Structure formats: C-alpha cells, structure tokens
Amino acid sequence: MNKLNCMMMAGTLLVTACQPTGKTGDVIGKQPVKVENGIMTTEVLMAFGRVSGPVVSPDKSKILYGVSYENLEQNKSNRELFVMDIDGQNKKQITCTPESEGNAVWIDGGKQIAYLSGKSGDSQLWIMNADGSNARQISYHEKGVHGFLFSPDEKHILFIGNVKYSEKASDLYPDLDKATGRVIDDLMYKHWDEWVEEIPHPYIASFDGKQLTDITDIMEGEPYESPMKPFGGIESFAWTPDSKAVAYTSRKKTGMEYSLSTNSDIYLYDLSTQETKNLTEGMMGYDTTPAFSPDGKYPVSYTHLRAHETLRHLV
C-alpha cells in the first residue's frame, strides 16, 4: 500500500458520515475522491478536511475539534464539530448543518459545549450537550457575535460585537437611500482593502446557564476598536482568575495618530465598579495578548519596545 493510499485511509477514519435528521439544506462535508496516477491534486487535498481548534475536556478524557471542508463549485466551506477519546478512539460527529460551527469550548465541567453558529442567519452564541443534543441559541446580538470568552466561574461571558463607526451619505441624507458615496474628513477611513464602517467592541453579559442578561458594552461611546484590526481576536482578552475583572487590548487613538502609531495598551475593566485602568501606560510599544498568573497578581502580555512597525516580540 503506497503512502498516498494510507493518507486517504487516515482522512476517511477522521470523521463519521454526516447524517442530518431533518431538512438542513446542502451540507458541505467529506466527499469521495479518486486518486489518479498517484497524483496529489487540489481536490485530493481538500477531501482530507482541515482539522482545527482542538480542546481537551476538563477531565482530560476527550478532545473537541472542528473539521472544515471545501466545495469548489460553490466556492464555500463548512466546518463541523467532532468529539473523540483522548487516545483517538470513538470519533463522533456532533454537528451536521449547512452553517459552520466554530470557536467551540467545553463548559459546565464538560457536560456542555459552547460554540458559534450562523444557523439563525448571523453568527451567534449557542450551547449544546456534550453529545451534540439539545442545541439552543443564547445570544441575539444585532450585529452578530464574533468571538467569546467565559469567565473562570462561568457566571459571565465576554463576547465581541460590532458597533457603527462612520456615517454614509445615506445616513446624512435619508432620502438618498441608494447613495453609495462616503463622507471622509479624516484618517483612518480604510484599512487595507476594507472600508472602516464598523469596529469591534467587547461586551460583558451575565450568564445563568440558560440565557444572557445585563449585557454591557464596556467601551460604549469610545471610537476605538477591541480587538484590534486586522488580526486581533479573542486572544486580545483575558479574565482574572477570580472572574472579577477582564483585561483587553486596544489602540485608543483616532485620525492621523491612529494611522502613524502602533502604540496599543492593555486595559483592565472591573465588573463591580465598571471602571477601566490602563495597565501598560507609558509603554510605547504594541501591547497585546494579556494573561494573568494563577494567583492573579501578575499580568503579562506581548509587547514591542517602540510605537512603530517591528517584528520583535517581548513578554
């Protein structure tokens, strides 16, 4: 048996068949592929699926992970969630939908799984049992949820949601609802190939195991982004071990200053007082990826020594 056939068998063993129980639409999943003349084509590679986001269960007995599959004709991909034993045995697919599921984590001591899904039309936070049953939506944020982080005691959830940043011509002149022009009077109106119309903000909500309440934008009214574009994600946030505060990364600058400087900071938001403190004030570099020591006494982060482009990371 040649190496290519062995690889194909390994890919086949990776997942089980997607068997939806009801009408779910076209599910992009694992497709049969024919290897001709032993050539590793694009189609063969895509048929393997891409494994990502492995998370070990709290009792260290299982692994939760996702597998993404592509459809060339539709120019789309789809990601499903799987669970297997820590030794690689008993693989089970626990989602089977046309919408991708991602950012999955164990909660409730491993009894449940929280994840993002676009099943309701946009990306929202969902919860299901560890075996994939009883899936239910718990967030209904207007502009969708783009990442989330449970507090250590699981009584609060931080999630990322977009807020409006700039006005369009149609906002200023409602009777011109088909207008596509833009009113630009300052930097930074475009980031690479993206018009800056919305920016991400961190929200904190209380969680009782069933629903989100007391949702608060902890940067409400601030014209700054967190996480920072274009690469920032949920790693830009960290809860303190006692669940009483959360650290976040932001570059609180606008206009020309935002365009010329990479000086970002780590901020600490206290849930009880709703006050924010700059933990890296005076540090002029690109401060990112906060974390805390187990006792919560020492915050750490990546940083740069200067406020301009550099590839050297320090801790």
Task: Report each predicted region and the residues it spans.
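C-terminal motif of bacterial Sec signal peptides marking the signal peptidase cleavage site
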Residues: T16-A17
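Predominantly five- to eight-bladed beta-propeller fold
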Residues: T24-I28, N162-G221, T249-K252, M256-D265, ...
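A short helix->beta-strand "capping" segment at the edge of beta-propeller domains
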Residues: K30-G49, I215-G221
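Predominantly a core beta-strand signature of beta-propeller blades
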Residues: T42, N90-K92, S133-A135, L212-I215, ...
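Conserved beta-propeller blade repeats
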Residues: F48-I63, P98-L116, A135, E142-I157, ...
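A short loop-to-beta-strand structural motif that recurs across blades of beta-propeller domains
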Residues: E80-F82, Q124-W126, H201-Y203, D265-Y267
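Short loop/turn segments that connect beta-strands within beta-propeller blades
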Residues: I86-Q89, N129-S133, F207-K210, D270-Q274
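Conserved small/polar residues in nucleotide/adenosyl-binding loops
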Residues: T303-H313
